[in-house]
Swiss-Prot record:
Species this protein is from: Homo sapiens
Protein's recorded name: Zinc finger protein 561
Family membership noted in the UniProt record: Belongs to the krueppel C2H2-type zinc-finger protein family.
GO annotation, cellular component aspect: nucleus
Pfam families named in the record: KRAB (PF01352), zf-C2H2 (PF00096)
Mapped zinc finger ranges (C2H2-type): 118-140, 169-191, 197-219, 223-247, 253-275, 281-303, 309-331, 337-359, 365-387, 393-415, 421-443, 449-471
Leader sequence segment: none
Length: 486
């Protein structure tokens, strides 16, 4: 075997192992490298072999360390030896792989077992499957896909150096040469774990050549597939199939649940998720259904009365942590959601969403009884209880019932006498934060609610609503005894 002159410093490197104390593998490797090989170093000199029993004694970190050190040694020695080979040897080595053992080494690595190996005659690049080679040749030679060879397990070329008997193994994608089959196997494993297909234009790496091929269309504007109907060109055949489907109206993908058809699988997946999202978790108390168990568990707390999330300011408890977070903002005054139209801020995003509809005038939820429209579905539900007379929320203190839970909550404070919201200017206390906000406008003079008809401004929205009835002539309140509207 040809010997290569290498100094000890060639192998100097930072410690791989995170331990302060060197492991037995690291010490063994350093012993090999520091044992006086000043004249020459061969592959056998730096190779550390373990018996199966010895290998079983190593932990995971030591095995990875062994792999890293051996890989570096193999790559360093191989690259140096490759450079000093005579030109005649180099040309003969470029013809293919050596020995059937090389194929066994490739099978040891992840991602290469069971495939044919195909190489390009022009650049020598190796591909795992023939279609990858054809795609590569199409890009390189403008459509000619004949300049390539494919090798199976039984057709790997065998070459022996008659003069020295030396056998070198070359893996074409990166040009590395190895004397030992295990060195090639370890090298292939690391190479496969990375992204071996690099774009020559921008340097971006890809795990599969097909991905690189599609990416190259960005730089070259190359359109390999063309739709004959109107001449549109696309970069991949899959895009062409979807393009044809759009113009022909062909919908080949069908969901089994409802029979609806789609042009591609991405469109098919959306309704499947809808079918999977059926509300299958049902509350045994009230029969209401939910999409998942977590929503059902939150709902059950309404029936049990458990409220684990407590406000540190006023002691109010909530069933969900999100409700507590929104409630705390009533104490801190934080309103992170601001309207871009008028600048009004809100403590909750839902409040901002509802407010935005006031600018557009959109009221998508309409009462079937009286035709009145609302901006939110909850407002419509609460309104329908006026017609039905339903009041599901009862006060545990006095038995009074309410249409909404918020009205019951406000009512409960009348029993406790608690007024947690205090004006910092005059010290007046209020039961509700909304009333404190209205009160503060008496100090600031702010009147944010403006009539669109006459321009008159009001501090409270309810007063604006009452004023607007002067212009519209609306009289929503009817006396049942006298049949008079007010």
């Amino acid at each position: 075997m040809a010997a290569i002159y290498l100094s000890r410093g060639f192998f100097s490197r930072e410690p791989i192992c995170p331990f302060e104390e060197k492991t037995k593998v690291e010490r063994m490797v350093e012993d090999y490298l520091a044992s006086g090989y000043q004249d020459s170093v061969t592959f056998d000199d730096v190779a550390v072999d373990f018996t199966p029993e010895e290998w079983a004694l190593l932990d995971t970190t030591e095995k990875y360390l062994y792999r890293d050190v051996m890989l570096e040694n193999y790559m360093n020695l191989a690259s140096v030896e490759w450079e000093i080979q005579p030109r005649t040897k180099r040309s003969s080595l470029q013809q293919g792989f050596l020995k059937n053992q090389i194929f066994s080494g490739i099978q040891m690595t992840r991602g290469y077992s069971g495939w044919k190996l195909c190489d390009c005659k022009n650049c020598g690049e190796v591909f795992r499957e023939q279609f990858c080679l054809k795609t590569h040749m199409r890009v390189q030679n403008g459509g000619n896909t004949s300049e390539g060879n494919c090798y199976g397990k039984d057709t790997l070329s065998v070459h022996k150096e008659a003069s020295t008997g030396q056998e070198l193994s070359k893996f074409n994608p990166c040009g590395k040469v190895f004397t030992l089959t295990p060195g090639l196997a370890v090298h292939l494993e690391v190479l496969n774990a990375r992204q071996p297909y690099k774009c020559k234009e921008c340097g971006k790496g890809f795990k599969y050549f097909a991905s690189l091929d599609n990416h190259m269309g960005i730089h070259t504007d190359e359109k390999l597939c063309e739709f004959q109907e109107y001449g549109r060109a696309v970069t991949a055949s899959s895009h062409l199939k979807q393009c044809v489907a759009v113009h022909t109206g062909k919908k080949s993908k069908k969901t089994k649940k409802c029979g609806k058809s789609f042009t591609n699988f991405s469109q098919l997946y959306a309704p499947v998720k809808t079918h999977k999202g059926e509300k299958s978790f049902e509350c045994k108390e009230c029969g209401r259904s939910f999409r998942n168990s977590s929503c059902l568990n939150d709902h059950i707390q309404i029936h049990t009365g458990i409220k684990p999330h407590k406000c540190t300011y006023c002691g109010k408890a909530f069933t969900r942590s999100t409700q507590l977070t929104e409630h705390v903002r009533t104490h801190t005054g934080i309103k992170p959601y601001e309207c871009k139209e008028c600048g009004q801020a809100f403590a909750q995003y839902s409040g901002l969403s509802i407010h935005i509809r006031s600018h557009s005038g959109k009221k998508p939820y309409q009462c079937k009884e009286c035709g009145k429209a609302f901006t939110t579905s909850t407002s419509l539900i609460q309104h329908t209880r006026i017609h039905t007379g339903e009041k599901p929320y009862e006060c545990v203190e006095c038995g009074k019932t309410f249409i909404t839970s918020s009205r019951r909550s406000k009512h409960l404070k009348t029993h406790s006498g608690e007024k947690p919201f205090v004006c910092k200017i005059c010290g007046k206390a209020f039961l509700y934060s909304s009333r404190l906000n209205v009160h503060l406008r008496t100090h600031t003079g702010e009147k944010p609610f403006v009539c669109k008809e006459c321009g008159k401004a009001f501090a409270v929205s309810s007063r604006l609503s009452r004023h607007e009835r002067i212009h519209t002539g609306e009289k929503p309140y009817e006396c049942k005894d006298m049949s008079v509207t007010i």
